[in-house]
Amino acid sequence: MQFVLSWVFLVAILKGVQCEVQLVESRGVLVQPGGSLRLSCAASGFTVSSNEMSWVRQAPGKGLEWVSSISGGSTYYADSRKGRFTISRDNSKNTLHLQMNSLRAEDTAVYYCKK
């Protein structure tokens, strides 16, 4: 049985009451349970390595849920993602990644990368 894993990459910088969107990308992917997927979020207008960066997700009909963060040399994960998900940065490409392994049906969600 397959399930749909969708994500939206969204990196925003607040400027007063305005929000400048630096990147928006949407895509839907069919992934087999137990499969793997790597998300990438390329940022512009700021340096990924100088900021705390996070992934959050929203499952169908539910609120936003924190997935993982990276700050300096430290990484943080929600308990249910430890050992399955790995957050990382590519400073040379100013890009944030989320490697997701051993995917489950309950991982079906819209994924957001955020500053």
Curated annotation (Swiss-Prot):
Localization (cell): Secreted; Cell membrane
Region named Framework-1: 20-44
A family per Pfam: V-set
Protein's gene: IGHV3-38-3
Subunit structure: Immunoglobulins are composed of two identical heavy chains and two identical light chains; disulfide-linked.
Disulfide bonds, paired cysteine numbers: 41-113
Protein name listed in UniProt: Probable non-functional immunoglobulin heavy variable 3-38-3
Domain of life, per lineage: Eukaryota
Region (Framework-3): 76-113
Keyword Secreted (UniProt): yes
Organism: Homo sapiens (Human)
Entry's Gene Ontology molecular function annotations: antigen binding
Signal peptide: 1-19
First-listed, main subcellular location of the protein, grouped into a coarse class: secreted
Keywords carried by this UniProt record: Adaptive immunity, Cell membrane, Disulfide bond, Immunity, Immunoglobulin, Immunoglobulin domain, Membrane, Secreted, Signal
Region (Complementarity-determining-1): 45-52
GO CC terms, sorted: extracellular region; immunoglobulin complex; plasma membrane
Region Complementarity-determining-2, residue ranges: 70-75
Record carries keyword Membrane: yes
